[in-house]
């Protein structure tokens, strides 16, 4: 017979590893290219010593002349806090009792919920990779009650639950999106009485300033990244090539050459 104890065991021993593996390896081509390691994790932080520039103890000279002065490598320490991505499912006791005499029925119930959770986790983790860590998914451009128009629906999807902020104040929590008109950028909420003002910002529930440091943060104009002052260490500012006309192979190659010559990067 399937019991709550059995269900807990299945979730821990069967599903946890599967979900973790799929999120780490199958969620996004960009994530798959990033080397993953835990060796720089210390407690609740990630600390990585990063060299920059070159060793300065180099110089030409005569056979019996003085050796060049010794200048060692230069380092900065990157510091970031660990981030948590939670996923929760809920199965009522009635659903468990209804399938208590059929292991197959209960497994199907778990499979459906876990697949849905994995899809939601994949969507949000993929979004975070390109975000700025704030959890911001949209800004309201036209106010409304039960619905509103936003600046972009790229990071929104039916079923997503969002918190609404006006400035630093949370005015609504965990409001679920039921429908999206992607042509008009109109978002509809399950709470038909929800009043949303223009300029309000939507964040994934509970994620305000708690998400991964994605490309949005790396390419932002902020002066600090991973605890390092980017005004003092200008090499930490990512290279952006402005293009007035069409993006051609020559333009792409010029950008690649710059990265290889200046940064020693190997562009994939």
Regions found by a protein language model. Give the residues of each.
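Long, contiguous juxta-domain segments that are non-catalytic but functionally important
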Residues: 52-67
């Amino acid at each position: 017979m399937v019991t709550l104890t059995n269900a807990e065991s299945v979730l821990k021993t069967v599903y946890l590893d599967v979900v973790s593996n799929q999120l780490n390896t199958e969620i996004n081509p960009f994530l798959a290219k990033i080397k993953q390691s835990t060796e720089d994790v210390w407690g609740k932080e990630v600390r990585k010593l990063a060299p920059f520039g070159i060793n300065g103890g180099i110089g030409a000279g005569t056979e019996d002349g003085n050796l060049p002065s010794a200048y060692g490598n230069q380092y900065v320490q990157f510091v970031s806090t660990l981030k948590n991505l939670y996923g929760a499912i809920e199965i009522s006791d009635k659903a468990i009792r209804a399938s208590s005499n059929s292991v197959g029925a209960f497994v199907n119930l778990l499979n459906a919920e876990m697949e849905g959770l994995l899809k939601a986790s994949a969507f949000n983790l993929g979004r975070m990779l390109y975000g700025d860590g704030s959890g911001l998914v949209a800004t309201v451009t036209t106010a409304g009650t039960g619905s509103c128009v936003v600046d972009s629906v790229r990071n929104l999807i039916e079923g997503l639950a969002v918190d609404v902020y006006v400035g630093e104040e949370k005015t609504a929590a965990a409001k679920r999106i039921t429908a999206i008109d992607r042509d008009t950028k109109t978002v509809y909420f399950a709470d038909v009485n929800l009043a949303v003002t223009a300029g309000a910002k939507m964040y994934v529930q509970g994620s305000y300033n708690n998400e991964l440091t994605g490309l949005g943060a790396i390419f932002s104009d902020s002066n600090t990244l991973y605890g390092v002052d980017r005004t003092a260490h200008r090499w930490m500012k990512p290279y952006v090539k402005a293009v007035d006309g069409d993006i051609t192979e020559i333009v792409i190659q010029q950008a690649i050459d710059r990265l290889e010559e200046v940064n020693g990067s190997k562009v994939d």
